[in-house]
Each structure stands twice: as C-alpha cells, then as structure tokens.
C-alpha cells in the first residue's frame, strides 16, 4: 500500500503540471482492482469501487498538500488549458477543422472555422476518452498490461488531442517503450523523431520559411561535399573494404 500511495502521489503531482499525468492514476487503479479480484477473490464491482476510492483519496490529499505547501492554491487548474488557444497542424481534429473551414470559405459560405473547430475538437476528445475507457476496462479484465494500456490510450489521445506539439508523443512513447518490443515500434519512433527534427526547429524558433529552406539546403550541400570528399579519398587510397 505504501508503494501504491507513493505512485498515486507522483502521478498526482505530474497531473498538476500536465493534466495528462492523471491518466496514470486510472490504470494503476485498474491494476490494483485486478489484484484484488485475482488474489483476494473480491467481486469486480467492489474491487473497482475500492480502487477508485483509494486513488481519489490520494489525489485529493496530494492536491491539498502541494497547494498548501507551495502557496499557489489551485492556480495550476487555470493554467492547464493555455496550449488549447493555438492551432496546431499536428493535431488531427484541428487540421480537419481548419481544412473544412478553409474549403467553406472557398465555396463562399463564410468563415466558420471557429465553430467547426469546436465540433471537430470535441469529437476528437470524445473518441479519445471512449478509447481510454475501453483500455481501462481491458486492463481490469486482464486483457492488456496496465503499462501497455496506458501507452496505447495516450497514443490515441495524442492523435485526437486539440493541440499537439512534437514532444507530446512522449506521453505514449515512454510507457510503450516498456511494453512494446517489436521492431515496427522502434522503427516508427525513430522515423517520427527524425522527421520532427526537421519539421520543428530547436527551442520552437518561428523562422521564416525561406530561412528554414536555406538552412536545410546548406546542410544538404555540406553533407554532399563531405560525402564526395570521403568517396574520393577512399578510392585514391585503394581501400576496398572497411573493417
């Protein structure tokens, strides 16, 4: 119980920084409920109620303790939605909403982008929440490992989240790295990381497109020159095989 309470404390602290941290509380709670069912023979509904009550107690106690010790009160609540004020092209629901609004303007229907975004973003969140609920109950039934359920649910959440930054994928990658060990997962993570290193500049710099193109072209030219010099040097030295 000490380890369970400690995990709840850490996850609650994480959730006060980023609301997605609270997701872990649900999967830890489901794992605990599964433990009660298998080890103690507790009825499913009773084990579920016990796990929910325990996690809620830990959450409320942690929020009260941290808020009192830091002196910030509940200010962390209002600061959670700051990212939702921007339009992120990486977000599926936002991209669909903006694209639909753009085509609506082309058809002469007026600019209804904000209203469309409200619909698409709400639908995206509902889809993510529904899938997360499915993963929670799959964890309770023992059909998926809690870490795998957390990673899969987080991945779907990132896909349908109203705002997505490149590093949001870490919400899913970190738990999935401890559960998914197939080559396709590793390849996908490497490919995504490599692509984002080109699409998004360090520190979120918003440079003009012409500047970004100049940087990439210069880097490509420098790489081509270095590769050509290396090839010439290897052939002139008579080296056939690199040991």
What are these regions (language model features)?
Residues 161-172, 203-212:
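Membrane-interface catalytic loops of GT-C/OST-like multi-pass glycosylation enzymes that act
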Residues 12, 60-68, 154-163, 191-204:
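Aromatic-anchored segments of alpha-helical transmembrane domains
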